[in-house]
Structure formats: structure tokens, C-alpha cells
Amino acid sequence: MLFIQIRLDEIIFRALEQQKGLTMSLTLYQSSVQSFIQTISAILTCLDKGRKFCRDNNIDRNEFIDARLHPSMLPLHFQIVTLVHFSEGAIDAAEKGVVGGPDMTLEFDYDGLQTYLASSLERLGALNESEVNALISGEVIFKYEGVILPFTTEDFFVTYALPNFYFHATVAYSILRSSGVPVGIANYIGKVKTTASPNIASQFHQYT
């Protein structure tokens, strides 16, 4: 029995060691900045489609600025501004160690909103990967309207910034879709990063 137990312990130990070797290593840059870039690029494409839709249907595109998914929800303008807040702003918060709410004083027309989002995308693309990864294991303190909430950098991104980012991206997409703009899931997903050949990768969206 002792021999069997030793053998079982050895098998379990080896299995655990193999599992460690298979553990995927995902950096802060990969899980945040690369995701921000992919989704913001996709939303910019949706906004471009919104512009074309308005032109083709003689609609003032600035009417979309105040469009809402539901009367109780905030408009497209807020969704885009907040998208920047929880992406580029999240990186800035990790650097400074503090985060608040989005800037509610910003005002843009449709063109200005596109430019604002495109400029943020450009700045995200210019970030240094090593410098972003070096922000790990820090602290970010949320301070807003009397609420103070401390996070580790990891928890700030995983449980707060990223969920909020995807929520506002989804609402922005849904506002455009519900307003008649011909966008679908492939437009929302955007350009995926794959090891497939360019020819195969180009066919991906027909399955989404």
C-alpha cells in the first residue's frame, strides 16, 4: 500500500509540473492595450458606417450624438467619451495610481467624437509595451464623489476597467445598430489576431 501511495504521489506531482508548463502567460499589455486597440478600431469602423448611413439616407449625423439605447441610458456621446476613459484613461490611472470618473465637460459633434476616439487610438498604439507591463503589482485608488476604493493594478484592469470598457463599447455599437446603421458582430469584433495565413484570416468574418 505504501508503494502504491508513493507512486500516486509521484504521478500527481508530475501532472502538476506538466500543468505548470502549460500555463499561459498573459501580460498586462496583451490583456489591456491590445484589446483596447482592437475594439476601439472596430468602433471607429462602426462610426464610419454610421457616417455613410447618414449620408446615404439624408440624415444629420449629429442627431446620433444624443441617440440612446434606452431612455434611462446615456447617449452615444457619453459612451464614446467613457470608452476613452476606460482604455487610455485606465493606463494613465495605473501610471498615476488614482482614477476618477469620466470628463463630463467634453462636448463634440459627430466628427469631433470620431477624431477624439481616433486620437486616443493613436496614443494607445504608441505606448511602450515594457513600460505598460512594468505597471503590474502597483495600486490604483478610485476616488469619485466621496467614494474611495483601492485596487491592485491587476484587479483594477480585470474587475473594473476592462468590464466597463466592453460595456460602453457594446452600448455604442448597439446605439448605432438600433438607429439603423448596417453593422454586425464582425464589425464589433474587428480585426482578430491569428496565426492563420492572411487569406484564411480574411475569410474569418463570414463565420461570425
Predicted features, each with a name:
Residues 154, 161-204:
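C-terminal or internal capping secondary-structure element at the end of a domain, subdomain, or sheet
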Residues 40, 44-51, 88-91, 118-125, ...:
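Structural signal for well-ordered, non-membrane alpha-helices
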Residues 72-100, 120-127:
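Conserved alpha-helical segments that form or flank metal/cofactor-binding pockets of metalloenzymes
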Residues 5-23:
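Short, Lys/Arg-enriched N-terminal segments with co-localized hydrophobic residues
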Residues 112, 116-119, 128:
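Mid-length scaffold segments of soluble, non-membrane domains
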